[in-house]
UniProtKB/Swiss-Prot annotation:
Keyword Flavoprotein: no
Comment field on protein domains: Consists of three main regions, an N-terminal coiled-coil domain that may assist in substrate recognition, an interdomain involved in PAN hexamerization, and a C-terminal ATPase domain of the AAA type.
Keyword Coiled coil recorded: yes
Keywords, ordered alphabetically: ATP-binding, Chaperone, Coiled coil, Cytoplasm, Nucleotide-binding, Proteasome
Protein name in the entry: Proteasome-activating nucleotidase
A biological process from GO: protein unfolding
Organism: Methanothermobacter thermautotrophicus (strain ATCC 29096 / DSM 1053 / JCM 10044 / NBRC 100330 / Delta H)
Locations listed in the record: Cytoplasm
Domain of life where this protein originates: Archaea
């Protein structure tokens, strides 16, 4: 009897162990199944997201195919606006039409001269197009600002101040002029010998202001066929008004603004037509708006008097050859990044380079560096600068230096 009880107890213990093992195995199996379920749910979510993305892409591609199947539109120009949602247009193919336009199109946009797109079958207006722009004109806009600041211009403190007052101040603080009750100046003419920093001043203006900067060399206005130059001038000012506040910089303006003479060739007459268009844009019937003008020339003596009257150019800023103090500042700017020997005397270089322009001084610094590179040296010596002065400005400057110091350079 006792043995039977022990056997029963043993079987019960065995069954308990088996139950525990089954529970553990069941728990482990459950965990595995839950992990697989979560993984499948995650995979399902990824597949659904991919399907959604592919559906959007298919929809986009179908829309692209539909756009390709759409027939091209006809470009026309509005000639007259009539009543009852009708306008008269002239198509690019030649004929004139009286057509309808949708009520969804803004009536104010349909002015004579506006460009519109017409349906090929019904010739109804389906869209109003932006005004046509000459690619030559749009290419004149400076997209990236020059890296020239006013601090990099030496010896022209007075000129910088006047340029700031004339060009920058009306754009940045127009309320000052309203408070005083005067119209801000909108035109400045920079004149002086070549290489004195006129274009550099214009670059600094472009760098310092947030206005649209349009740069053009005046010779680009000179065109082969009659009326092309005037059209280009008109396009430049239209672009400037559209993107105002803006600044137009006309370099070498004497190319189109020379004095008009009685006797002239057909080419001269076309240049004069271009000049008259420029005069009209500078101070014509329509206001220039928030558009500033900066022009530069080496020959102010040959400019047409009509260009020089107030209202077209309000300020005339002379950019002369730098004096000794100016040359010293310019040399300091150009040598600031150079490896100079201790013997280099900037004061002396400023004294012996009388008559040098800012461009000459920059060339002297560059040449001195080239002499050091040629001799495989790590620094620029005074002898290199003297050789550079000799090369850029002539032997007389080196002789002047020898007389001052009694030093000979081989």
């Amino acid at each position: 009897m006792e043995n039977n009880s022990q056997n029963v107890l043993k079987k019960i213990e065995d069954l308990k162990k088996e139950v525990r093992m089954l529970k553990e195995e069941n728990s482990k199996t459950k965990r595995n199944l839950m992990w697989k379920i979560r993984k499948l749910e995650k995979d399902k979510l990824l597949i659904e997201n991919e399907r959604t993305r592919l559906d959007r892409e298919v929809k986009s591609l179908r829309g692209e195919i539909e756009r390709f199947r759409t027939p091209p539109l006809v470009i026309a120009t509005v000639t007259e606006v009539l009543d009852d949602h009708r306008v008269a247009v002239k198509s690019t193919t030649g004929p004139h039409f009286v057509i309808n336009y949708s009520r969804f199109i803004d009536r104010k946009q349909l002015e004579p001269g506006a460009r519109v797109a017409l349906n090929q079958q019904t010739f109804s207006i389906v869209d109003v197009l932006p005004s046509e722009k000459d690619p030559v004109v749009t290419g004149m806009e400076v997209e990236e600002k020059p890296d020239v600041s006013y601090e990099q211009i030496g010896g022209l403190e007075e000129q910088v101040r006047e340029v700031k007052e004339t060009v920058e101040l009306p754009l940045k603080k127009p309320e000052l002029f309203e408070k005083i009750g005067i119209e801000p100046p909108k035109g400045v003419l920079l004149y002086g010998p070549p290489g004195t920093g006129k274009t550099l001043l214009a670059k600094a203006v472009a760098h310092e202001t947030n206005a649209t900067f349009i740069k053009i060399v005046a010779s680009e206005f000179v065109r082969k066929y009659i009326g092309e130059g005037a059209r280009l001038v008109r396009g430049v000012f239209e672009l400037a008004k559209e993107k105002s506040p803006s600044i137009i910089f006309i370099d070498e303006i004497d190319a189109v603004a020379a004095k008009r003479l009685k006797s002239s060739t057909s080419g001269d007459r076309e240049v004069q037509r271009t000049l008259m268009q420029l005069l009209a844009e500078l101070d014509g019937f329509e206001s220039r708006g928030n558009v500033g003008i900066v022009a530069a020339t080496n020959r102010p003596d040959i400019l047409d008097p009509a260009l020089l009257r107030p209202g077209r150019f309000d300020r005339f800023i002379e950019v002369p050859l730098p004096n000794e103090d100016g040359r010293r500042e310019i040399l300091k700017i150009h040598t600031s990044g150079m490896a100079l020997a201790e013997e280099v005397d900037i004061e002396l270089l400023a004294r012996i380079t009388d008559g040098a322009s800012g461009a000459d001084l920059k060339a002297i610094c560059t040449e001195a560096g080239m002499f050091a590179i040629r001799d495989e040296r790590d620094e620029v010596t005074m002898a290199d600068f003297m050789d550079a002065v000799d090369k850029i400005m002539g032997v007389e400057k080196e002789e002047e230096y020898k007389q001052e110091t009694g030093v000979m350079f081989g």
